[in-house]
């Protein structure tokens, strides 16, 4: 199980999800949520992930159930909002996971919103461990900047001198 969690973190980082500033626990939960959205169970291969094109979309509570059942968590079903706000926030911002995949126009607090792996990211994820992995990661980044680079970008703001009397 730990090996798959480590691989999930490698994949997320390669796809531009920043993880270095997260606690180890937050990184592990993000990896488990990511694998749950992908429909992975221990022992499965990355080639077996499911994405939005497969119509595999999970609600927050379904993600919790999957994490509890297959990834050794003990998360209350009442913690569904934490999944969205904490565990899936960065992968969603990085466009690795699509939120509201079931209904793109759903409100943020709509209980019917489903999460799914972005098909563009799924093409890359399925190549993890193969010879074409690095090339597919590079192709993925040609189409979009990484979230990590976007968040770390230096802002050049015009500054106005202020004098306090």
Q: Language-model features: where?
A:
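A short, highly charged nucleic-acid-interacting micro-segment common to nuclease
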Residues: 77, 163-165
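Intrinsic-disorder-associated interaction segments
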Residues: 1-5, 26, 56, 126-130, ...
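Short, amphipathic alpha-helical interaction segments positioned at domain boundaries
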Residues: 101, 106-163
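Mixed-charge, low-complexity interaction segments
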Residues: 39-47, 51, 85-123
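Long, low-complexity, charged/polar intrinsically disordered regions in eukaryotic proteins
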Residues: 1-43
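Generic alpha-helical structural element
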Residues: 19-22, 52, 80
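Short amphipathic alpha-helical interaction segments
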Residues: 28-29, 56-61, 74-100
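Short acidic, hydrophobic short linear motifs in intrinsically disordered regions
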Residues: 44-76
């Amino acid at each position: 199980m730990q090996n798959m969690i480590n691989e999930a973190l490698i994949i997320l980082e390669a796809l531009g999800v920043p993880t270095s500033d997260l606690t180890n626990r937050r990184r592990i939960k993000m990896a488990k949520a990511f694998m749950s959205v992908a429909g992975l169970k221990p022992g499965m291969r990355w080639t077996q992930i499911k994405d939005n094109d497969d119509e595999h979309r999970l609600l927050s509570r379904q993600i919790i159930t999957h994490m509890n059942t297959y990834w050794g968590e003990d998360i209350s079903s009442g913690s569904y909002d934490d999944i969205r706000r904490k565990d899936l926030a960065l992968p969603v911002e990085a466009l690795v996971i699509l939120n509201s995949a079931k209904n793109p126009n759903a409100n943020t607090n709509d209980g019917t919103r489903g999460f799914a792996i972005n098909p563009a990211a799924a093409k890359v994820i399925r190549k993890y461990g193969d010879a074409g992995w690095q090339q597919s990661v590079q192709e993925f980044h040609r189409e979009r900047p990484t979230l990590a680079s976007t968040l770390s970008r230096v802002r050049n703001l015009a500054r106005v001198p202020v004098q306090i009397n």
